[in-house]
């Protein structure tokens, strides 16, 4: 998507059109333009001080990854009957190889228990949320909202251009999780499409001759 471009570069889309590629699916993500954010209802809604008191934000505390990953696996299994694409070991390996581009943020409560967190993939101008889940206590205390606000402010201050939440669609874009999309919009996120094309290589070769 264009939010990962340093400069206008839609020549690939034009080429796909010229060689007869067919749009096969369109997923919808949400991103915030950090240089001119549209802070929505969830941004302006105050998080109760009592609920957020005692929360601690931890950055790149990788020894706590297994605790957060247990939350990720539990939420995905319970709510969506699925599993994360990566294992905790794979995420750690990605960080070891690309430490500046794979970041871990976790939130601990007063008992030093991890209750929510996020794994982010960071490019030169865009921060992408790869995994972000919250346990029961975090949902009760709205700790995930608190974390999102902290992350947006963190990367806005560092001059990043976009903060991307990830897709809110399933089945190749045919189903939109409206509640999830609404939540992202509440923080100022707006739509970014992820397109997939089907290309007949023989047809494309003939079109280029």
Predicted regions and their residues:
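A conserved beta-strand-loop-helix scaffold within acyl/acetyltransferase catalytic domains
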Residues: 1-138, 154, 170
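Aromatic (often tryptophan-rich) hydrophobic motifs at membrane interfaces
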Residues: 101-208
